[in-house]
């Protein structure tokens, strides 16, 4: 079983915190040089991985990960996992951003995708799913 680690980049360390907790394979799309080949590989892995995870943190500068998460929650809800971390190395969302993100979480949850609030909860779920026979 494998998971695509999508979501906030911008020197956010959530992936560094989550990866040691995982007992499954993963694809980390973060690269030093974002090329057309890297983009193609990311799209391929989003399709191939058993789960696609989107972790959103206050270090987010663009909104495309939110679009991807919403799209995947519509097209592949059983494979989509979404999480909003409200603090990232001292950075926090504004109250207005939090309201929008809460609405996004509700939309994704209503699409029957999984929504978690902590990296530990994500790891527990993925590790459990890794033990379940296909």
Where are the regions that the model predicts?
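Conserved catalytic or regulatory cores that recognize and/or transform ribose-phosphate-containing ligands
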Residues: 1-134
